[in-house]
Amino acid sequence: MPNLLGKVRALQAEGVSAWMYTSNYAYPPTTLTSCVRDDLYFVPEVLGVKIAMGDHRSSFPTQEEVMRLLTQIRVGAMVAGKLGVLHIHLGNIVGPFDMLLECVKRGMPIQHIRPTHCARHPDVFKGAIEFGLAGGYVDITTGGSCAVGSPAHGVKSVLEAGVAADHITMSSDGHGSVPRFNDKGEMIGLGVGGVACNLKEVKRLIGELGVPMTTALSVITSNVAKALQLPGKGVVKAGNCADLNLFDENMNLVHVFAKGRQMMRNGEIIVKGTFEE
């Protein structure tokens, strides 16, 4: 965890915005301080906690353990002036949404519960739509496998099911580890997730599926900022951070600005990381 925090702060020093979730897949969670509550309170960069559910990476926490974790997140975030979220890595084992919706029925505000990889299994996708209709956020991963045609098709299906457009997000899972399995479920290799897939799926939403540009762009901009309560992010307006992507008429990325500093010019990266050439 200290290494992760160090990387977040290194990215900030290099001119981009960065935050983190504490822990990994496991329960009990791994923390920087003595507990999840204190991580949220004492570490500005920590927005929440990550665990896995319904997946071979999961520790399969019980209903009561998930509730206790959510209460720690809620209390720590309230004191720190943050939203506080439980970021949940979903797998191919069905059932997690039953547990998550039970937490909501018991009184836990749904905005603290954030499942991701919602379209990698048909039954999990159905559960995600039910969760979205209950007021939760549905996050479609643009990298890796997708059980509904493409991530863009997943977003359109969630929209057509009646989930609020501002409660749908996409994330790349970029730079995450990507294991490769054979037909027996045996791991045969390990790769690294790419970061270009968000833009690819936004283009598909607009060009192939006819989703309005404002709606398509919002799933990787304003919706994300709203979902995580990131002040000054996600919307271009006076007083906000000058994070800007400029495209040509064919939706090719031409210029990029991060906090007002130009990072890409005419398709060429002009600002690189400390150890990049």
Predicted regions and their residues:
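Active-site core of metal-dependent hydrolases
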Residues: E65, T71-F181, E186-G189
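Conserved active-site and cofactor/substrate-binding residues in soluble primary-metabolism enzymes
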Residues: P2-G6, P61-E64, R68, D98, ...
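Divalent metal-coordination and catalytic microenvironments
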Residues: L11, V49, H89, V138, ...
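Active-site proximal loops enriched in glycine and acidic residues that flank catalytic Cys/His/Asp
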Residues: H117, I140-T142, S172-G174, L217-I220, ...
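C-terminal cap of metal-dependent C-N hydrolases
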Residues: V235-E277
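Active-site loop-helix segments enriched in His/Asp/Glu that coordinate
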Residues: M1-G76, L90, F97-C103
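His/Asp/Glu-enriched, well-ordered alpha-helical/loop segment
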Residues: A161-L246
